[in-house]
């Protein structure tokens, strides 16, 4: 659905209703339409869509048909220089790696100096070892050229790393928009919170204008005004694991431990509750399966939602 909207913006698909505007200029509405080739919008496809029978230089020149030929070559060569592909101008797509093809597709899209560049999952086809490197170099190029870019991705980590603004969509609707930090630390819905990380969940009880949890009590967040059941959510890294019992800590037994290199993912069963929680700890702490540990949690850093309404705004501190 998100990709379909990118194709609508580019003019590759026709809307059934509504309007599309760019810098207050109508690109499409029921009364007027600007054709795709007149919109000056670049598009980098997921599979790059390079022409196999054209050289790298010719692929980039292809999008510059309205410019005199001698100028086209100069512009294309400059675009390839920007993406560090000058040494491949006479190569053909089948001789290039996935990362090199991606850079050629980027050069072709940037050469006409588009008002907006659309990119569909541009890094998903790359080897995971090269993905971070190519992604960062692409973002650097886009910033150097001051190109406004809409990137479609289903990778939450990628969105947090590269975006200035994120628009999170679910079932065809915008759930939340804002900076990466706003969406991560202040998710307005349970869906938004879960999209960017795994969550632990515990029950609460309302008593004397407070929420009572197994980790202590906290004032009821002001945005939660109904009498519906409220649940507390928190990320695995927020759960503190210690070998020594402290105030408000709960005894738990490690039922599994997964080695992640720099950290461990622990599954913990709270002894006083029929509840299993997840926690990340540094591997240097050397926790083993069946160890007894003590858990504590800063409730002021948790998210609170009504159990039957994932639209409610959360309680969180940044």
Residue ranges and their predicted role:
Residues 36, 40-42, 46, 50-191:
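ABC ATPase nucleotide-binding domains
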Residues 199-201, 210-318:
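Non-catalytic connector elements of ABC transporters
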Residues 185-207, 233:
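C-terminal boundary and immediately downstream tail of ABC-type ATPase nucleotide-binding domains
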Residues 10:
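Helix-to-loop junction immediately C-terminal to a conserved catalytic motif
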Residues 13-14, 21, 65, 143:
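A position-specific signal in ABC ATPase nucleotide-binding domains
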Residues 16-19, 171:
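Conserved coupling/switch loops of ABC nucleotide-binding domains, chiefly the family-specific signature
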Residues 18-29:
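Conserved ABC transporter NBD signature motif
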